[in-house]
Amino acid sequence: MRLLIIFILMLSNSFASEVTDIKNLVINKELKSYSDITFLDIQNKELNLNDYKGNLVILNFWATWCAPCKDEMPSLDLLGENPNLDNLKIFPINIGKDTNQKSLTFFKDLEIKNLEIYFDSPNTLAKKFKLRGLPTTIFFNKDGLEFARIIGSIDFADEKF
């Protein structure tokens, strides 16, 4: 996991648009800036990505009906328990039309302990980021700029990282 974060940090300083050896990872040629990136927590409180500048941010888009999302979520959860990653903020954002209870059950069934549930309502981020499938994970540098994304599932605990 530590190698994953080091790799991602190195990528945040890279401007080469390419798919690397890591399955489904696309590195942006140029950093992408977005305005008004907001999402909701489980209490329907609005959060803004700008409030997390100074941190490396991961937005992971998922849904309860998505089998690859179910496979990926436990390894994403492991990133949240690493004490060496203080400046990493992970926001798993449900883009399905699921109820809070269904999302909580999904996390409980997978024994997710280090992540909280967030929602994209009403799917504005899915459109803004032009998501092509689930799961999709988008990486933002400390300036709040997108530098890479993973389209599809990945094992965040894989030794490649």
Regions found by a protein language model. Give the residues of each.
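N-terminal "domain-start" segment that seeds a small globular fold
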Residues: 17-49
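Short active-site neighborhood of thiol/selenol oxidoreductases, capturing the structured segment around
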Residues: 48-70
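Structural microenvironment flanking redox-active thiols in thiol-disulfide oxidoreductases
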Residues: 70-110, 121-127
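Thiol/disulfide oxidoreductase modules built on the thioredoxin-like
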Residues: 109-113, 120-161
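Active-site acidic short loop of glycosyltransferases
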Residues: 52-55, 85, 112-114, 131
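Sec-dependent N-terminal signal peptides
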Residues: 3-12
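Hydrophobic beta-strand anchors of alpha/beta hydrolase catalytic cores
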Residues: 58-59, 90, 137
